[in-house]
């Protein structure tokens, strides 16, 4: 429906005044916004990148990753850092839990010599450091581990047993309001790791909740629920965890998709194992009996050998990855869900998702 000429002139004058006062780009028509194509960073898991719909975690946004203890939260964020560093990006790790293991981080592919690290004394200090890094425009990825460990200054200076009702929630709420705009302007990805708590007296529905109040839930563009659903075994030895991630909230694509992958102890996400599974599912890799082949060439007998072959042939692995991304990311109705091939090396646990 056409706007009459007088209204168009008035609108043009108003837009000109706003741009003069607040700068070019402060207001625009949504279709003209060049930032609509969101830049993303890989999570290190191919199936999770596809479940997110955009090929990874969005830059300039807030992301929350939560789950039970030992579910792979820190491992997943370290894989994001490693992927970002491979693209030449600068990353920072705010270690509020004082538990970051640099040796483990290096094993996952993190360049620890170029990783900025801070172990703040208080929650306010941690969030101010995040804000300063974001405003600098020089840091691309910031990880905060974890929201539960962001202790307000008043609580640290008080006695154990004192009541500090709502302090952490108020601190997080103020920080979110301040950070959201700065992150967008500097195109910085901020990832919060969070823990799960149980609500008391919940008879029906899910009693689980995350720490730090509700502000983070609202401001996060992506929320990921990560759970350990099984054990990866070699013979009698447990060598890793079978992991499921559910995209609980997603502002950049359709939510509620989920991905399953293996986290191997000391190695991180079994990326090449995912590549074999998704390659077979999309008929890029042929499987006949126990043998796997690509373009008529046998690449291994059994999934473990096929995975090892792809690891030794990164050019072919990249070619298959590119084809899988093109097939699944171009189709909005696609899902990366797959059953692990013949349940090979997977033992179920009783943990609820």
Swiss-Prot record:
SMART domains tied to this protein: AAA
Pfam families documented for this protein: RecA, RecA_C
Annotated GO biological process: cell motility; DNA damage response; DNA recombination; homologous recombination; recombinational repair; response to ionizing radiation; SOS response; translesion synthesis
Single GO MF annotation: damaged DNA binding
Free-text activity regulation comment from the record: The rate of DNA-strand exchange is stimulated by RadA.
SUPFAM superfamilies tied to this protein: P-loop containing nucleoside triphosphate hydrolases, RecA protein, C-terminal domain
Domain of life the protein comes from: Bacteria
Chain intervals with Acidic residues compositional bias: 339-353
Full protein name: Protein RecA
Gene name for this UniProt entry: recA
